[in-house]
């Protein structure tokens, strides 16, 4: 198939989508193992019968419901539920020949019936619109939908919108375009690149270090950042040092609480900074001299300082701020933002209340700017409205400026009104987005800074205070910093001290990265894109490379082994500069500046040579150490092996003999009591990690997860006990905390709401968003 260069001869209408196409260059379709048709200029309506509906294909069911609510009976809206086809799950899925990359795409089993339904609807539709998300991922999903429908992109109008509102949907229908094949190629290059790295390198890691490990272009760069910080922390050598503080008062009658703490900044022409005074004796000698000095106010410096209003959110800053202020993980933030974008209940029915949430742009539509300024004028006050709208520009290369920043879609839907429609977490995130957008268009805050210098014969002390003169954007965001007010001083004024003392301090190691901190670093280095930050952190946690403890990402030992091997043999994979440069090339593909296969081959050729060489040259860390003992089952020698959870002893004749020696270990006790037999519970280890087991095993085989189940603020409908969130091999379920006395259980998330028909408990529907179902009578409530 040939890539299309579309020449629009007339304005595209919703009912007739016509385009003239010509061959431009070999592209994705030519290299895809699918059944493709040639481009055609036949209109999209020529085969339809009169009275047919228009079909709109989106990604998510929630988005489909919201759009259907706006458009009515003339439109059928169906959701693809994400990618309808992808590279095969358990095979490499890419044929590489003569510098060409030919991917094989499979339609997943759970999408097969959906594709059939889409094909049937398309056959009877007047026009079929592709309305997947506006990023590259959405562009590629739209392309694959067209392929699955055995169509040609010239026959499928592509509509995009930054927000799911009636006006935005209507505008997009009046202004369709074609699927952008450059963006599709960029996404496919990324997908194939990630498959090449992940499939080939993960296999090598499993061969050389241990099963269940993975590597990836963005994932491994992020892990290298975390490992480097962990090395800094472990190598850190704390140092003691001394600071000298003087407690001065403006006049001798000042109260105790009015003492002002001044810092020693100079002594005998020596600048006193952190780590300058490391000797306790020297600090005490200086202290003795200072206590005999007379002091006066040498200078007073007063300055006006401006704190600029923050820009509206893009994906990375939303994730960082949500993590810091709300305690939400990046995954949770994006999940809630997705719901707010796709549609929630409002007084006017279903509507998207924020713009698209995967964006690296700071652009704001003119209409939205005008609305924000009107809101500030009428709801906050004219003193807070700047003379003109503030325009922000993203600094990173590749930022898609055609998109918008994240903002509310309707400023009349204030957080106060939204409280009646949104859940607690949805309201928290919506309020954060709403207030940040309004703040971005408000005046800057103004502070008055006051610096006072006090001199002795040999010394100089300083203190700095500040006072908020005009709150500006803090009016809506709030200001957590309290004013540090200083009393009135006069230059030359004699001043007394109440006390002078040396304070011993100790340097601290750099902190572990938080999720927000890692995202900020990845963004600053140009690693990854808005859609990759949350999944990258999630996979590092899932692979047990890091653990999240008290909001900090703690690197595990296995990560050091993985990074050491990658640094020694695949340095470019963990090199942040290389990863950022590759990201930049993907941007160039999307802008038609580079050929996608050339970029892939440039990476693939040297990479696959290293993989081939590494299979024989890289020393395995699965070294088997002899124990001198014999296997009790087959008589071969027992050896020490490295596993994911440390060393263990097994038969050297594995896999023919699968004997594993159970080492006698000190029993790790717990405070838990077995509810079945009353014996104490102990901590044991399985291949999935630690768990609680009854000390009476094998007589009592009771076992529980080590982590306490999450307690819900929902009462059991059977006995009134508290419901708990538990996990099984089949997934999450909810059971009564009074088990086994009460055996109430449900697979759907419970709520405190009651069924208006029978009074039973309402639970969230497992597949239908914004829908609840009664556990007793199965009544469905939307």
What are the roles of these predicted feature ranges?
Residues 236-253, 257-262, 296-336, 347-348, ...:
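C-terminal accessory/connector segments of nucleic-acid motor ATPases
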Residues 69, 117-151, 157-304, 405-462:
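Phosphate-backbone binding and catalysis cores of DNA-processing enzymes
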């Amino acid at each position: 198939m040939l890539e299309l260069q579309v020449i629009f001869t007339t304005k595209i209408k919703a009912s007739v989508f016509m385009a003239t196409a010509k061959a431009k260059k070999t592209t994705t379709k030519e290299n895809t193992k699918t059944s493709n048709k040639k481009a055609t200029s036949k209109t999209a309506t020529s085969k339809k019968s009169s009275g047919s509906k228009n079909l709109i294909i989106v990604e998510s069911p929630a988005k489909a419901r919201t759009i259907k609510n706006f458009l009515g009976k003339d439109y059928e809206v169906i959701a693809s539920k994400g990618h309808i086809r992808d590279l095969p799950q358990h095979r490499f899925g890419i044929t590489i020949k003569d510098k060409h990359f030919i991917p094989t795409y499979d339609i997943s089993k759970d999408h097969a019936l959906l594709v059939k339904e889409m094909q049937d609807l398309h056959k009877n539709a007047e026009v079929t619109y592709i309305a997947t998300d506006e990023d590259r991922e959405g562009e590629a999903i739209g392309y694959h939908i067209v392929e699955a429908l055995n169509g040609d992109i010239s026959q499928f109008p592509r509509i995009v919108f930054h927000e799911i509102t009636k006006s935005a949907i209507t505008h997009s229908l009046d202004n369709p375009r074609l699927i952008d094949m450059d963006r599709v190629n960029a996404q496919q290059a990324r997908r194939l690149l990630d498959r090449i790295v992940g499939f080939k390198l993960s296999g090598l890691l499993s061969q050389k270090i241990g099963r269940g490990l993975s590597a990836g272009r963005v994932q491994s760069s992020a892990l290298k950042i975390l490992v480097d910080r962990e090395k800094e922390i472990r190598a850190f050598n704390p140092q003691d040092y001394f600071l000298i503080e003087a407690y001065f008062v403006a006049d001798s009658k000042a109260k105790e609480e009015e003492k002002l703490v001044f810092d020693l900044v100079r002594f005998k022409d020596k600048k006193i900074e952190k780590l300058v005074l490391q000797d306790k004796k020297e600090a005490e000698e200086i202290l003795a001299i200072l206590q005999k000095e007379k002091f006066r106010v040498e200078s007073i410096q007063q300055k006006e300082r401006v704190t600029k209003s923050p820009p509206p959110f893009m994906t990375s800053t939303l994730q960082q701020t949500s993590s810091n202020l709300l305690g939400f993980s990046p995954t949770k933030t994006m999940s809630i933002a997705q719901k707010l974008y796709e549609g929630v209940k409002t007084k006017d029915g279903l509507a998207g209340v924020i713009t698209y949430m995967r964006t690296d742009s700071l652009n704001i539509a003119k209409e939205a700017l005008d609305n924000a300024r009107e809101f500030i004028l009428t709801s906050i006050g004219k003193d807070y409205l700047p003379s003109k709208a503030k325009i922000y520009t993203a600094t990173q290369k590749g930022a898609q400026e055609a998109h918008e920043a994240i903002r509310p879609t309707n400023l009349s839907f204030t957080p106060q009104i939204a409280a009646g429609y949104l859940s607690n977490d949805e309201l928290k995130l919506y309020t954060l987005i709403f207030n940040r957008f309004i703040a971005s268009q408000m005046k800057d805050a103004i502070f008055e800074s006051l610096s006072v210098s006090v001199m002795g014969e040999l010394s100089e002390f300083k203190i700095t205070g500040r006072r908020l003169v005009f709150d500006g954007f803090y009016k809506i965001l709030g200001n957590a910093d309290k004013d540090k007010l200083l009393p009135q001083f006069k230059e030359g004024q004699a001043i007394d001290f109440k006390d002078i003392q040396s304070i011993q301090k100790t340097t601290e190691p750099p902190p572990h990265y938080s999720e927000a901190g890692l995202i900020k670093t990845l963004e600053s280095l140009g690693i990854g894109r808005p859609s990759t930050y949350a999944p990258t952190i999630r996979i590092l946690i899932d692979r047990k490379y890091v653990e999240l403890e008290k909001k900090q990402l703690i690197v595990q030992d296995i990560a050091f082994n993985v990074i050491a091997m990658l640094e020694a043999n695949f340095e470019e994979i963990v090199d942040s500069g290389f990863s950022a440069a590759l990201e930049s090339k993907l941007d160039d593909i999307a802008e038609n500046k580079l050929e996608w296969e050339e970029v892939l081959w440039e990476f693939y050729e040297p990479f696959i040579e290293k993989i081939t060489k590494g299979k024989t040259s890289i020393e395995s860390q699965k070294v088997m150490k002899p124990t001198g003992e014999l296997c009790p089952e087959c008589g071969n020698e027992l050896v020490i092996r490295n596993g994911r959870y440390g060393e263990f002893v097994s038969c050297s004749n594995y896999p023919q003999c699968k004997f594993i020696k159970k080492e006698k270990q000190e029993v790790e006790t717990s405070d838990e009591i077995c509810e079945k037999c009353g014996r104490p519970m102990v901590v044991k280890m399985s291949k999935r990690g630690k768990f609680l087991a009854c000390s009476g095993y094998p007589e009592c085989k009771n076992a529980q997860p080590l982590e306490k189940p999450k307690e819900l603020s929902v009462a059991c409908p059977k006995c009134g006990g508290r419901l708990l969130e538990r996990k099984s091999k089949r997934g999450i379920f909810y059971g009564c905390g009074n088990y086994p006395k009460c055996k109430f259980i449900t697979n759907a998330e419970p709520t405190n709401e009651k069924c208006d028909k029978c009074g039973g408990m309402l639970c969230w529907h497992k597949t239908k968003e914004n829908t609840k179902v009664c556990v007793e009578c199965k009544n469905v409530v939307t």
